[in-house]
């Protein structure tokens, strides 16, 4: 009994500290220092209505828009409640069929040549809001034709919306698809 009292007390104290105090302090600091990010990095329209998050991919399938990476969520696309990659290896027959179907689908829309991997493979979370600048640029002819815009205008827009590596060395250059499409809508008006 002598040894169990400190163990129970230790359990109670650390449950309160780690399960209550620490999360409350970190959440308070996040709301004070990074208020937009702490609330989900929501993007709003002119009227203030939330139309998406800069952190979660959004479904776009209209030819007038740039398309994101495929979603790995199966019940409905880009569902953050069921995110996660397929964990299928590069030689898995199901994975190869899925990628082959996606490549064919993109070729059917007029995309020719090499297709960047991020247009046919879901990200690890299945919710990635970004594509590579190359993935955006191979879509330029389709979007230009659908919107009646020049390819030069769209290439400039993609270049302007390309984000650099974080801290200059982390990750790769990327384009947030939702933000790119919102800019596209502003230009088309």
From Swiss-Prot:
It comes from the Bacteria. One of its GO terms (cellular component) is plasma membrane. Its main location: membrane. It is found in: Cell inner membrane. The chain crosses the membrane at residues 6-26. The keyword Cell membrane applies. It holds the Pfam family KdpC. GO terms for molecular function: ATP binding; P-type potassium transmembrane transporter activity. It is a single-pass membrane protein. The keyword Protein biosynthesis does not apply. Belongs to the KdpC family. The system is composed of three essential subunits: KdpA, KdpB and KdpC. HAMAP family: KdpC. Part of the high-affinity ATP-driven potassium transport (or Kdp) system, which catalyzes the hydrolysis of ATP coupled with the electrogenic transport of potassium into the cytoplasm. This subunit acts as a catalytic chaperone that increases the ATP-binding affinity of the ATP-hydrolyzing subunit KdpB by the formation of a transient KdpB/KdpC/ATP ternary complex. This is Potassium-transporting ATPase KdpC subunit. It comes from Geotalea uraniireducens (strain Rf4) (Geobacter uraniireducens). The lineage of its organism: Bacteria, Pseudomonadati, Thermodesulfobacteriota, Desulfuromonadia, Geobacterales. The gene is kdpC.
């Amino acid at each position: 009994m002598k040894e169990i009292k400190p163990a129970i007390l230790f359990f109670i104290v650390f449950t309160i500290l780690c399960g209550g105090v620490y999360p409350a302090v970190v959440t308070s600091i996040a709301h004070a220092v990074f208020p937009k990010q702490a609330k989900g990095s929501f993007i709003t329209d002119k009227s203030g209505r939330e139309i998406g998050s800069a952190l979660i991919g959004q479904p776009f399938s209209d030819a007038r828009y740039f398309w994101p990476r495929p979603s790995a969520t199966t019940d409905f696309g880009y569902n953050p409640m069921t995110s996660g990659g397929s964990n299928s290896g590069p030689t898995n027959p199901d994975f190869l069929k899925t990628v082959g179907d996606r490549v064919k689908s993109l070729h059917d829309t007029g995309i020719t040549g090499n297709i960047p991997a991020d247009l046919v493979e879901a990200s690890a979370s299945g919710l990635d809001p970004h594509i590579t600048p190359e993935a955006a640029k191979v879509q330029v002819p389709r979007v230009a034709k659908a919107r009646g815009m020049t390819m030069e205008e769209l290439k400039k827009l993609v270049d302007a919306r390309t984000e650099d590596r974080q801290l200059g060395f982390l990750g790769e250059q990327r384009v947030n698809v939702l933000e790119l499409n919102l800019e596209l809508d502003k230009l088309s008006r």
